[in-house]
């Protein structure tokens, strides 16, 4: 009769068991998804003072969330910021058009101003042109009386 030798077995200890944690089986993507879904706020104050005289006090508030969660909370400043939205190109083009219109209007104004100055200079050189209209009309009326 053959017998198989019996080997002593090791008693099981707690070192073989895995301690469950809240991040067990979670990848970085899972953690980010949870944080962005719920949102997280980090707040802090920085104060610099010398001899109980406060020089600088900075309050920092940081909100990390998904775009959808931020919209739910009423935060959507990036939608109206021309540097962060697709409207920026349209605003640049509109700005260029307005600059061109402004330059055109300034050129027209300069031309009109110089023309008005020239006209004033010409009329100042010819005093006959400065006679009031009623004097011219009264002289014409005098001639008609002489003819009759």
Curated annotation (Swiss-Prot):
Primary localization: other
Location of the region described as Disordered in the Swiss-Prot/TrEMBL record: 1-21, 118-148
Compositionally biased tracts (Polar residues): 136-148
Subcellular location: Gas vesicle
Keywords: Gas vesicle
GO cellular component, one term: vesicle membrane
Keyword Magnesium among UniProt keywords: no
Subunit details: Interacts with GvpA.
Protein name (record): Gas vesicle protein J
Species: Nostoc sp. (strain PCC 7120 / SAG 25.82 / UTEX 2576)
UniProt lineage: Bacteria, Bacillati, Cyanobacteriota, Cyanophyceae, Nostocales
């Amino acid at each position: 009769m053959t017998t198989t030798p019996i080997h002593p077995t090791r008693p099981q200890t707690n070192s073989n068991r895995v301690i469950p944690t809240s991040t067990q089986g979670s990848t970085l993507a899972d953690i980010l998804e949870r944080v962005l879904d719920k949102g997280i706020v980090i707040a802090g104050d920085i104060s610099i003072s010398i001899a109980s005289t406060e020089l600088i006090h900075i309050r920092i508030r940081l909100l990390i969330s998904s775009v959808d969660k931020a919209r739910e909370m009423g935060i959507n400043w990036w939608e109206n910021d021309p540097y962060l939205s697709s409207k920026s190109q349209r605003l640049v083009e509109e700005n260029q058009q307005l600059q061109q219109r402004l330059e055109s209007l300034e050129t027209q104004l300069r031309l009109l101003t110089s023309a008005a100055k020239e006209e004033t200079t010409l009329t100042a050189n010819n005093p006959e042109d400065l006679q009031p209209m009623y004097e011219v009309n009264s002289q014409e009326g005098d001639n008609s009386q002489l003819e009759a």
